[in-house]
């Protein structure tokens, strides 16, 4: 079971090696790189390539690590108890499984994407250390220990907005997706636009890389810019 890229995703040798090491050694993979370099898409394509379900956990600035485990709706349970609702007899009716619980609960191995982990509070990664190490967590409301039935393949993306804790990094593989060179970029364009003329690709890439070379540019154009340019050229 190896990943070498897909018909929709051009993977470099180094990136494929990182993914395959993660598969073989069952450690999370942290993917960093410029916005638009295909970090999130990698998880989607890995899942498709390996015929696994993809579970996506998109992290926001307000996201707490505990939300990946579960959320207990005590307010609704209190209200239902006041209304005499029979559901209050089973506390599980008020527990919403998080993405980590979903991944642990799957009968088959899944790909778990923890997307843009650096958006959350600095303690967020450390709060997941034990759960990712042991592949289990305790649900206080039900008194259950939730253990992973199959260890998920975990891919974590980061835009490098803030540094991740050393203790967390030590437990993961790491790969930085370098921005594609011209040859790799040509391959990416051909994958998505197989019928586009070579001279149009050359003109689009000349313009693209010239813009990226402009000194002092804070936000350089990403791969999506090339895709938009190719769409315009084909219109």
Annotate each PLM feature.
Residues 1-199:
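AAA+ P-loop NTPase catalytic core and its hallmark functional loops
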Residues 18, 207-210:
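Solvent-exposed, amphipathic alpha-helical segments
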Residues 67, 211-213, 228:
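Short, solvent-exposed polar/charged micro-motifs at secondary-structure junctions
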Residues 199-207:
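Amphipathic alpha-helical segments of the small helical/lid subdomains adjacent to P-loop NTPase cores
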Residues 204, 223-224:
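Active-site-adjacent segment of 2-oxoglutarate/Fe(II) JmjC oxygenases
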Residues 209-221:
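A short helix-loop-helix "switch/interaction" segment in the helical subdomain of ASCE P-loop NTPases
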Residues 225-232:
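Conserved small/polar residues in nucleotide/adenosyl-binding loops
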